[in-house]
Amino acid sequence: MSVRSAEYPRPKHFLVHLSDTHLVAQGELYDAVDASTRLREVLSGIVASGARPDALIFTGDLTDQGHPDAYAELKAIVEPVAAEIDAQVIWAMGNHDDRSTFRSLLLGEDATDHPVDNVYDLDGLRVITLDSSVPGHHYGEISDRQLDWLRSELAVPAPDGTILALHHPPVPCIQDLAVLVELRDQSRLADVLRGSDVRAILAGHLHYSTTATFAGIPVSVASSTCYTQDLNVEVGGQRGRDGAQGCNLVHVYDETIVHSVVPLGAHVTVGEPVDADEGARRLSAAGIRILESEKAGRSIV
């Protein structure tokens, strides 16, 4: 029997994209949602799947009011999971976050109110977090100084390209009220990104999953882990709901990046369940193999 290789090898990099955890210091979020429990449920699903991402990337609104106790609980929930699956944690600021508390408690840095912009190297894949928050407001904006910094960072391409992570997505708002809190002056950001090695933009803020392109770059918005927006609401209206939470899987290949939505919750099994061993047996029986990517470092599961 001849052996055929699958059209694509395994991904070079694997990330999990989470957003809008909105943890509170005590009680339930808006007296309706246990945000901590929802986050634990999402992370438990990742661990149970056997997935081993390079990084967990959180795109802002990590707490609802920027309270130190909420950040402490966030670390207590996320860091043990990250250690268990050997994943780096990458935090980005959101409009509900507090810069000084974010810096001191999550990054271990001096508490300042300067924008929280950082660069991470994941075995050749560059991840840049860009702070789109405006203290005291819920809309997003990126300053001239930040844009100059970003342009400088992007001047030298990374071996496997760059992923930009920020809270406010540079996409059209399909809910009218969301225009109040959109990212402003987006064309200035587009001018910096156009022609760069940025391969994908990860964002949150909207509390529903969506995709678009910006300056020719794919944009992937992750739903919230705490509550989401009902997109079947009356046109022109808005309604949050305790449902449809989740995260996104981001598989990075040489020529493309795949973003996949993972909804929270267990559902009735349809058809025959197949475990990993049986899946491998069937591929072998069919004479198909999936090649490993040419990556120096950890293997992708």
Swiss-Prot record:
Keyword match Hydrolase: yes
Keyword Transcription regulation assigned: no
Chain residues that bind Fe cation 2: 61, 95, 167, 205
Entry's EC annotation: 3.1.4.-
Needed cofactors: Fe(2+)
Cofactor comment text: Binds 2 Fe(2+) ions per subunit.
Pfam families found in the cross-reference section: Metallophos
Record's keyword terms, sorted: Hydrolase, Iron, Metal-binding, Nucleotide-binding
SUPFAM superfamilies: Metallo-dependent phosphatases (SSF56300)
MF (Gene Ontology): 3',5'-cyclic-AMP phosphodiesterase activity; metal ion binding; nucleotide binding
Binding site for AMP: 22, 61, 95-96, 207
Residues involved in Fe cation 1 binding: 20, 22, 61, 207
Family statement: Belongs to the cyclic nucleotide phosphodiesterase class-III family.
Stated name of the protein: Probable cyclic nucleotide phosphodiesterase RER_40650
Species assigned in the record: Rhodococcus erythropolis (strain PR4 / NBRC 100887)
